[in-house]
Amino acid sequence: MKKLLLAIAFVAFVFSVSAQNVQLHYDFGEGRKMLTSTVEMFKPDKYGSTFFFVDMDYGADGTGIDNGISLAYWEIARAFKWNETQKFMPRVEYNGGTMSIGDGIWIPIENCWLAGIERTWASADFSKILTLQANYKNIKDKLEGGTKNQNGFQLTAVWVIQMLEGKLTFTGFADFWKEEMFWGTDYRFLSEPQLWYNASKNFAIGGEVELSNNFVGDEFAVKPTLGLKWTF
């Protein structure tokens, strides 16, 4: 789960309010069968906006962990503005975490720094929103046995579509980036479209489908979830 607040964040930005939500998903993906929690926050101010999320997995096949956290990962980003009519916003971002691979072994999700620019489009009633980002990406100690940083790029799209007078929300993101992997690929793709039925202003029932290529391994994978979401 990631970046799933960024699209609705534009609405929050327009009206200068913050937004937060908590999600809990059960993952049906092969070899997973686990719970994942996501905490997200978006907060605008007169100089731009701050966004972060924290993902945690609670056990999974192959991690050797049945009672506890098997993965922790977070991203934090800051976008900058200097006037109210600004269309393009410079941005910086940090990603990092750690995960269990079994037998008591934990490996880092390498520190990653991104810098780039973003642009958002919205319909007149803000029921349809699209944000596109283009970033330079630096992954620390990724190459040559952990002694050399890797430089690349990342392209991101984030969207939200409100349907049935706001009772149904289709949202998600797609990332495409360059990263050399030990299984021989250089490019990776990850998308997590979500569909939510908004039972009330705060509570939603739905889920997501994780679509990835060269993300966990040298393959295309589809991993569905069922989820609950509470928006503060």
What kind of feature is each model-predicted range?
Residues L4-F15:
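Sec-dependent N-terminal signal peptides
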Residues A19-G62:
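Short glycine/proline- and aromatic-enriched beta-strand/turn motifs that initiate or cap beta-hairpins
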Residues N21-D27, K33, A60, G64-A157, ...:
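Outer-membrane pore/translocation modules
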Residues F42-P44, A77-K81, E118-A122, V158-Q162, ...:
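Transmembrane beta-barrel domains of outer membrane proteins
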Residues Y47-F52, N83-P90, S123-L130, I161-F170, ...:
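Repeated loop/turn-to-beta-strand initiation elements of outer-membrane beta-barrel proteins
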Residues N135-F203, E210-N214, W230-F232:
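Outer-membrane beta-barrel transmembrane domain signature
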Residues A221-F232:
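Outer-membrane beta-barrel "beta-signal"
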